[in-house]
């Protein structure tokens, strides 16, 4: 028994020693972590600049709980934050703010702006948890701020937020006012040149600025520039935020809305702080769009009428509100429902005239009520002006005399009243003058691609282009259809390196084929490696070692695609050569194997998000680098994207889940049956063993009785 007790005591002592060792190690690790977390950091800043003191919070068990933040300077408390309430010392008032929701800084970090020379010193962050015991953990960071000397400004200006009508005051105390001069700027403009501020600002002898009274237009960035006699210059900036009640700045006396069409009734207001509510009244009563069918509130408070009718006419007023209140309702806006004009006479779709003749294009319109005549204006759809000395207007009819080749094109007649504008188009064609074919063909190339561009011969609606091309040695032509009617370029791919190709551009419209352009020849760049060495060529292309065109601009390289929730994110590397001449990137994608152009886009970044790609489809993507001067474009290598079918994936997941569940159920049933069988077998074995034990015990009793009988007989015989 004593040996057992001693063994128990030895085990308890070993466990206690192990526990003490673990606690000691944890204490050492926590102390080292605290020392590392509270290491001192040296920072430098100039007068008038800003600096961020970073301070992370170590929550217990990584669970955020209420915390208290203290910042001290040279062991004097300067800033306190607790539950969205702050307290700042007078010297740092308006200059020290908590940094909120920034991924690079901790929750207890602060930003010190408008730094002064007196801000130099030691800063310490301390975080505590009032509702937890112990309330202090390993939170805290120490910083030493060194303010660079030799400046001209002793006290820089500080950002201010005041109410309209109050006085704004900015410090700009010069270090040596006897040989320095200060000047103030608002948004980069000298204050003496700002007409609204000329009579309301005053500069003190030390360089400080005061504005009295302030107006809402005074909001902006103010900059103080101090220059000494030696020509040294120092600047400091501060922002002035003017807050005022929400007010209406403009309200038209009358607004015409088109009958039967959508329309918007705006309320022109300004508010700082931002708008919180906008109240509309009609004919002196509250106008709630939620109770009026077909009328909705827009995000800016405007009224949107889905379909204007006579019931929407009336006298409207709007009243904006913000946190400071309202400056009052707007003047009355009389809303008049007016029917849009209709054409009584419209021009024909096509007019064919001869050179030197006159063309007359009729156009007349009336209001639906027949009382007023809308104003009619003629113009060309391509934006070119009408011939000043050869056209005349009579009512709504346009007459052009002495027709020349340049007069052909599409003309628009616009009829306008106070409610809406309607248009009608007519095309003027000159007889015996064939439509001009595409011209001014230009191109640039890589080893396997040629991008060709052209100018349209003439502008017509629904005009389509087809590029015809062939190898100079080949007898047959190939075609590439340009599906986007607004694009005047095409990229022919899968060409042979170092070969010359011939091109023609055919314009087509709904009236039939047009004319071919002049034949144009261009050569692909020679390949520095063998054409059959595809792997080496692809590797060289991926690494961006593509021979630059004549302009020196290289091709984008390392084009990749990553699937995400929005679709596919494309990413590529900038060209190795000619990056200074890069203007933008053009992204194009086709549906394969039809090689059908799905879309194109332009971006200034080296990435682009592809959205809404059709499932279970193969797409080909290419990125072109577009230059600034010569408008050249250099394509990257092609990338294939196989968009999987989400339906198949979902079906596979559901089928797999059902299969796994079925297997689990089968396994559970098998285990249950097996356990029942084993339990039944064990029950039989136990009953059999009990019977055998009973039989054996009976035999033993009979033997013992016989032995006793024999012993009794022997005793009697001996007696």
Swiss-Prot record:
GO CC terms of this entry: axon; plasma membrane
Compositional bias of kind Basic and acidic residues: 705-719
Chain ranges of the Ig-like domain: 40-128, 134-241, 246-334, 341-429
Topological relation to the membrane, as annotated: Single-pass membrane protein
GO molecular function annotation: cell-cell adhesion mediator activity
Protein family per UniProt: Belongs to the immunoglobulin superfamily.
Subunit structure: Interacts with tutl.
Protein name: Protein borderless
